[in-house]
Amino acid sequence: GNISTALGIALASKQTFAVLGDLSFLHDLTGLIHREEINCSFIVINNDGGGIFSTLPQRGVDGFESVFGTPHSLDPAAIAKAMGISATTISSVDELKKTLKAPVKGISIVVANVPSRDENADSLKAIYESMNSI
């Protein structure tokens, strides 16, 4: 999974940041069970489900939320803490910048709470459209 891959990459580095979505984090939790002396900070983008799927044409059709959105209402930081892993939650760009400037010591989880999946998808669409017009 994504967590195990990031940890493997981090073995060859002094410190690593890995970015993944909340669903990827939840699916790959077992990768955090056997920890080595690895310096890897996971930035978990938490939009309560599969945000990437909200960019697809099926967004808004009947059944979309249960099949693609898959909201979970879980707290990734609380789950990480229950596993004995350092975890914090951020909700601003300034907090993210501060996190990225700090040294990475061991394995940690930084949960970045972001706008709703729909707002996020609309923002991505606007970015893609502006890039296509260049």
Task: Give residue spans per PLM region.
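Thiamine diphosphate
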Residues: 1-134
